Amino acid sequence: MRRVLFSCFCGLLWSSSGWAVDPLGTININLHGNVVDFSCTVNTADIDKTVDLGRWPTTQLLNAGDTTALVPFSLRLEGCPPGSVAILFTGTPASDTNLLALDDPAMAQTVAIELRNSDRSRLALGEASPTEEVDANGNVTLNFFANYRALASGVRPGVAKADAIFMINYN
């Protein structure tokens, strides 16, 4: 009985290989990256950073494009390789995909969070910040700003918070 089952199993393997078709042809995938001696670490005080954007009346955000005051924040990196670094923020995009959406749709409505570079220009999600040079000790501080931005008129009050993730680009 075992020989019969084994023979049937082998027969199935050989017969199915004759019918295998590759309808897509060959697909090439190019993978690339860098291997570095060491990478930056985030200063322990900045690992779970909270940026308090403050309390604002809805009258501050009456029309689409209205913003609140800029709130400065920084990320301190240590142990970086020589050269320069840039930061790239990611997160859930708002209807304006350059802005960070709030965490919960039940929160404040028609408002998003805008990130800005140290020169106060907008830093869109997924876009690298300007580079900053690493000092001789392997440290660098990158300065940013954040603010609320109305996506449309009729902002409704509520909690307005979001999470952003950052990646370090080495140059």
UniProtKB/Swiss-Prot annotation:
Explain the induction of this protein.
Expression is negatively regulated by H-NS and subjected to cAMP receptor protein (CRP)-mediated catabolite repression.
Explain what the UniProt record notes about the effect of disrupting the gene for this protein. Deletion of the operon under classical laboratory conditions does not result in any major effect on E.coli capacity to form biofilms compared with the wild-type strain.
Q: Gene Ontology cellular component?
A: pilus
Name where it mostly resides.
other
Choose any GO biological process term that the UniProt entry carries and state it.
cell adhesion
Cystine crosslinks: 40-80
Q: Where in the cell is it found?
A: Fimbrium
Q: Tell whether Nucleotide-binding is among the UniProt keywords.
A: no
UniProt keyword annotations, A-Z:
Disulfide bond, Fimbrium, Signal
The highest taxon in the source lineage is Bacteria
Q: Where is the signal peptide?
A: 1-20
Look up the further comments and give them: The operon is cryptic under classical laboratory conditions, but is functional when constitutively expressed.
Q: Which family does it belong to?
A: Belongs to the fimbrial protein family.
What the protein does comes down to: Part of the sfmACDHF fimbrial operon. Could contribute to adhesion to various surfaces in specific environmental niches. Increases adhesion to eukaryotic T24 bladder epithelial cells in the absence of fim genes.
NCBIfam families named in the record: PRK09934.1 (NF007402)
Which protein, by its recorded name, is this? Uncharacterized fimbrial-like protein SfmF
Upper taxonomic lineage: Bacteria, Pseudomonadati, Pseudomonadota, Gammaproteobacteria, Enterobacterales
